[in-house]
């Protein structure tokens, strides 16, 4: 049994177009805000109530950053899996501040577009920062043969060219 688990799963809507920045060595980092909502009926008044939570999501995975940059826009519905991390920083007056974020990096991250793209297709990416000096560094890309139900992007992926979708026919389950 594992000693501990740090996994966050969210389904929500993107509140604004994602912000993409680059590190000094050119690696992309995507920042986005995702809203999740819950609704209920007030027992006393019978009135419908809604509570919205805003979550900051940071994507370090290069393949997933490409998908975010190309296909994710304000209003998009996303399914994400990542890890919860709190970082400490100082504001302009020197006071310590803390930010809790959902971080997508490495092989344990997932980003799935649930409502497809504007053209009706979905994005799919192998993605992944495999480290070292191999040729796999940037990962997947968009697979135009993916289903119109939306795309799925896994953090741990496959080499750059991807695999053909017809390989699914050989899976025995």
From Swiss-Prot:
Protein name stated in the entry: Single-stranded DNA-binding protein
Residue stretches of biased makeup (Gly residues): 119-142
Molecular function (Gene Ontology), one example: single-stranded DNA binding
PANTHER family: SINGLE-STRANDED DNA-BINDING PROTEIN
Cellular component GO terms, alphabetical: nucleoid
Gene this protein is translated from: ssb
Function: Plays an important role in DNA replication, recombination and repair. Binds to ssDNA and to an array of partner proteins to recruit them to their sites of action during DNA metabolism.
Subunit structure: Homotetramer.
InterPro entries from the UniProt entry: NA-bd_OB-fold, Primosome_PriB/ssb, ssDNA-bd
Membrane-spanning segments: none
Higher taxonomy: Bacteria, Pseudomonadati, Pseudomonadota, Alphaproteobacteria, Hyphomicrobiales
GO terms (BP aspect): DNA recombination; DNA repair; DNA replication
Disulfide bonds: none
Organism expressing this protein natively: Agrobacterium fabrum (strain C58 / ATCC 33970) (Agrobacterium tumefaciens (strain C58))
Protein keywords: DNA damage, DNA recombination, DNA repair, DNA replication, DNA-binding
Residues spanned by motif Important for interaction with partner proteins: 168-173
All copies of domain SSB, residue ranges: 5-111
NCBIfam families (alphabetical): PRK06341.1, ssb
């Amino acid at each position: 049994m594992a000693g501990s688990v740090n996994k966050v799963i969210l389904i929500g809507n993107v509140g604004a177009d994602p912000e993409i920045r680059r590190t000094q060595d050119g690696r992309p980092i995507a920042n986005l805000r995702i809203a999740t909502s819950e609704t209920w009926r007030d027992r006393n008044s019978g009135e419908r109530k809604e509570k919205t939570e805003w979550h900051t999501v940071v994507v370090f995975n290069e393949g997933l950053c490409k998908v975010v940059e190309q296909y994710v826009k304000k209003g998009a519905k996303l399914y994400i899996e990542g890890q919860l991390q709190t970082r400490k920083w100082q504001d302009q007056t020197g006071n310590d501040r803390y930010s809790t974020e959902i971080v997508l990096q490495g092989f344990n991250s997932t980003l799935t577009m649930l409502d497809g793209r504007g053209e009706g297709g979905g994005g799919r990416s192998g993605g992944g920062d495999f480290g070292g000096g191999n040729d796999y560094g940037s990962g997947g890309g968009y697979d135009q043969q993916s289903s119109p139900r939306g795309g799925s992007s896994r953090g741990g992926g496959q080499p750059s060219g991807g695999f053909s979708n017809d390989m699914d026919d050989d899976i025995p389950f």
